[in-house]
């Protein structure tokens, strides 16, 4: 009698990754950029936006934004309970900027000065809420638009006639000032998205960022964004 053939080891099992996102921008990023770079033949990505409110009478569901942790927790648990096999995972993509105070680890991490250690504290706290090896918590430093600062030249190609030389110089100066673009802070008027909007008046938070990133080398984004790269590396190793 011949040796039993292990089809599982011979066939590349496609991994399913549910990504709980803050809003439409992140969903578009997953569908249009992240999936392409991870590989359509290796992964099936399922981005899901946080449900913020539901009007049962009107039959409407409202999505996007993170006002409190309870809504996030509800959606994460819903997906976790739906996982039926070991080839399915769940991760998150929330901006550090604007996280609610009741988010796990937020209060405890405020005394930590090193931003990477602070984010690690928050992610660990989020992970401990579920104690599931298939759950990979990720918080974006400081917000989604940080990724756009990885290549201002690509941004110029998309918005070349919508920002003057002074505006472009301000963006270049921002990179020089911080050196590490993941450190561009989360102030009300100084977060990455606010800096972009100040220089590019037509910048739209939902659509413009995706336009710019589609023209940017994904490898360059990973090189410029240490924490983001660590997340991608984790997903690639599944």
Residue spans of the language-model regions?
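C-terminal accessory helical subdomains adjacent to catalytic cores in phosphodiester-
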Residues: 1-13, 27-59, 73-238
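Non-catalytic terminal and connector segments of soluble metabolic enzymes
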Residues: 63-69
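Catalytic nucleophile-elbow at a beta strand-turn-alpha helix junction centered on a G-D-S/GDSL motif
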Residues: 18-28
């Amino acid at each position: 009698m011949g040796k039993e053939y292990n089809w599982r080891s011979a066939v590349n099992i496609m991994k399913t990754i549910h990504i709980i996102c803050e809003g439409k921008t992140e969903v578009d990023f997953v569908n249009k950029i992240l999936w392409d770079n991870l590989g359509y033949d290796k992964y099936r990505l399922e981005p899901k936006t946080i449900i913020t409110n539901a009007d049962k009478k009107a039959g409407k569901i409202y999505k996007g934004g993170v006002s409190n942790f309870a809504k996030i927790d509800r959606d994460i648990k819903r997906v976790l309970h739906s996982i039926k096999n070991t080839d399915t995972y769940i991760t998150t993509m929330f901006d550090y900027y604007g996280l609610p105070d009741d988010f796990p680890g937020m209060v405890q991490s405020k005394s930590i000065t090193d931003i990477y250690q602070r984010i690690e504290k928050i992610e660990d706290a989020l992970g401990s809420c579920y104690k599931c090896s298939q759950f990979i918590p990720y918080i974006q430093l400081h917000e989604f638009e940080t990724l756009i600062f990885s290549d201002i030249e690509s941004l110029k190609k998309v918005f070349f006639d919508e920002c003057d030389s002074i505006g472009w110089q301000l963006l270049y100066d921002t990179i020089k000032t911080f050196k590490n673009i993941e450190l561009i802070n989360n102030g009300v008027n100084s977060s990455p998205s606010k800096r972009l909007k100040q220089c590019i008046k037509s910048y739209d938070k939902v659509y413009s960022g995706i336009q710019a990133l589609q023209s940017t080398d994904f490898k360059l984004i990973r090189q410029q964004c240490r924490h983001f790269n660590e997340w991608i590396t984790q997903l690639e190793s599944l």
